[in-house]
Swiss-Prot record:
Record-annotated membrane-spanning stretches: 11-31
Organism from which the protein derives: Escherichia coli (strain K12)
Topology versus the membrane: Single-pass membrane protein
Domain of life: Bacteria
Function: Modulates the activity of the EnvZ/OmpR two-component regulatory system, probably by directly modulating EnvZ enzymatic activity and increasing stability of phosphorylated OmpR. Links the two-component systems CpxA/CpxR and EnvZ/OmpR.
Protein name: Modulator protein MzrA
Description of its domains: Interacts with EnvZ through its soluble periplasmic region.
Pfam families on file: SecD-TM1 (PF13721)
Positions on the Periplasmic side per record topology: 32-127
Spans within the Cytoplasmic topological domain: 1-10
Molecular function in Gene Ontology: protein kinase binding
Gene: mzrA
Entry keywords, A to Z: Cell inner membrane, Cell membrane, Membrane, Transmembrane, Transmembrane helix
Protein's cellular compartments: Cell inner membrane
Subunit structure: Interacts with EnvZ.
């Protein structure tokens, strides 16, 4: 009777260790992903934003991969997998886009920083 009890205990411990290792791997992969974003804004209010297709064309011609191109308010956001890709894209777009645009690089290192950025971007009115 003691042999099955030991096997059940060992099975429970190995299951717990396996669950812990799986959880740690998931947490590590989530922390390791560091996206980077380029924000393109017009300097003057009347200037139109470049369309996403022209941005895609410039980046593709230089072999720079990106995750997404999204318009938001009066800004065009381009998301990359790494800050190196974002820096290369910034250099390309600085050369190829006409003057009159601000191209800013934003590294999204953590979920907490993304939430703080969202809170800072929204205007809050009390009273």
């Amino acid at each position: 009777m003691q042999i099955p009890r030991m096997s059940l205990r060992q099975l429970a411990w190995s299951g717990a260790v396996l669950l812990l290792v799986g959880t740690l791997l998931l947490a590590w992969s989530a922390v390791r992903q560091q996206e980077s974003t380029l924000a393109i804004r017009a300097v003057h209010q009347g200037t139109t934003m470049p369309d996403g297709f022209s941005i895609w064309h410039h980046l593709d011609a230089h072999g720079i991969p990106f995750k997404s191109i999204t318009p938001k308010n009066d800004t065009l956001l381009i998301t990359f997998d790494s800050s190196d890709q974002s820096a290369a894209a910034k250099a390309v777009l600085d050369r190829t886009l006409p003057h009159g645009y601000i191209i800013a690089q934003q590294d999204n290192n953590s979920q907490a920083m993304q939430w703080l950025t969202r809170l800072r971007d929204n205007s809050h009115r009390f009273g």
